[in-house]
Amino acid sequence: MFQHLLIATDGSDLANKAVQHGLALAKVLNAKTTAITVTEPWSSVVAGEMALAFPPDEYDKSVAANALKILAQVEKFAELADVPCDTMHIKDQFPAEGIVETANGRGCDLIVMASHGRRGLKRLLLGSQAQKVVTHGMIPVLICR
C-alpha cells in the first residue's frame, strides 16, 4: 500500500503523537520513513524593530538548535518503535510548502502530520498548515488529532 511515509513535525505535543502514529503505521506496512521539521524564513518571522534585536544569523542559530532538538526526539521515537527513519531540517520555507515539496522530491506516497501545531494566533491569520498541505499536496495526507 504505502511504501514511503513523510512525517512532518514541529515538536509540539500533538505533532509528537502524529510522529508516533506515523512510525507505528510504517512498522506495520514495512514502509520507509522520512521525518522533517520546517523552519520559516527570517523575513517572515521577524518584522520592523524586532529585526534589529534578532538579526538573521541569530535567528538561524536559534531555529537550527530547535530543529536538532525536535529531530532528536523523532529519532528516539523511531528507535523505540524499531523503525528506521531519516530526519531532515527543511530551512527557510513556509511549513506547508516545505512539506509538500519534500514529499514530492523524496518520492513519498503518504504525508503524516498533526491537525495543528504551535502556531496559535498566527494560525488563525494564515490558515492551517495541515489544510494547506491537503489542498496543495498531490498524495494522501493522514491528519492526526
What kind of region is each of these model predictions?
Residues G22, V74, I99, V133:
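Aromatic/hydrophobic pocket-lining residues that form π-stacking "cages" and hydrophobic walls in ligand
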Residues A18, V45-G48, E97-V100, R123-L125:
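Short, well-ordered secondary-structure micro-motifs
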Residues V141-R145:
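Short hydrophobic/aromatic patches at helix-to-coil boundaries
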Residues M50-F54, A103-R106, Q129-A130:
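Short, hinge-like loop/turn segments at secondary-structure boundaries
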Residues F54-K69:
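A short acidic, glycine-rich active-site loop
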Residues L110-T135:
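Glycine-rich, Arg-bearing micro-motifs that act as flexible, cationic patches
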Residues K76-I111:
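Structural beta-alpha unit
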Residues Q3-A53, F77-D86:
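Small/aliphatic-rich secondary-structure junction motif
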